[in-house]
Amino acid sequence: MSLNSAEKAEIINEYKRGDKDTGSPEVQVSLITGRIKYLTDHFKENKKDFHSRRGLQELVNKRRKLLKYLKRNDQARYQTLIQNLGLRDSY
């Protein structure tokens, strides 16, 4: 299971840059981070779910690429995003 539509809307409203913004790197990274948090909780109970673990690795890699893009193009937005999400500056 993934994030439901209410959780997605809440995340989008928190990180959007405009009225109808759903595709900015900040929104994408925050949605992916929510899915990653959900999957890490899922793996605490389901240790042998290797198919979902592969999906988690893909999400982590996608988030890493988006954060690298954001850091390369707008350092200030990158810094505020990782502070708000509680991520380390390792990209």
Swiss-Prot record:
Record-given protein name: Small ribosomal subunit protein uS15
This protein's encoding gene: rpsO
GO MF annotation terms: rRNA binding; structural constituent of ribosome
HAMAP family tied to this protein: Ribosomal_uS15_B
Keywords of the record: Ribonucleoprotein, Ribosomal protein, RNA-binding, rRNA-binding
PANTHER family, alphabetized: RIBOSOMAL PROTEIN S15, BACTERIAL AND ORGANELLAR, SMALL RIBOSOMAL SUBUNIT PROTEIN US15M
Any single GO BP term: translation
SS bond partners: none
Organism: Legionella pneumophila (strain Paris)
CC per GO annotation: cytosolic small ribosomal subunit
Role noted for this protein: One of the primary rRNA binding proteins, it binds directly to 16S rRNA where it helps nucleate assembly of the platform of the 30S subunit by binding and bridging several RNA helices of the 16S rRNA. Forms an intersubunit bridge (bridge B4) with the 23S rRNA of the 50S subunit in the ribosome.
Pfam families, per database record: Ribosomal_S15
Subunit (UniProt): Part of the 30S ribosomal subunit. Forms a bridge to the 50S subunit in the 70S ribosome, contacting the 23S rRNA.
Domain of life: Bacteria
Gene3D superfamilies: 6.10.250.3130, S15/NS1, RNA-binding
Keyword Metal-binding: no
Family, similarity comment: Belongs to the universal ribosomal protein uS15 family.
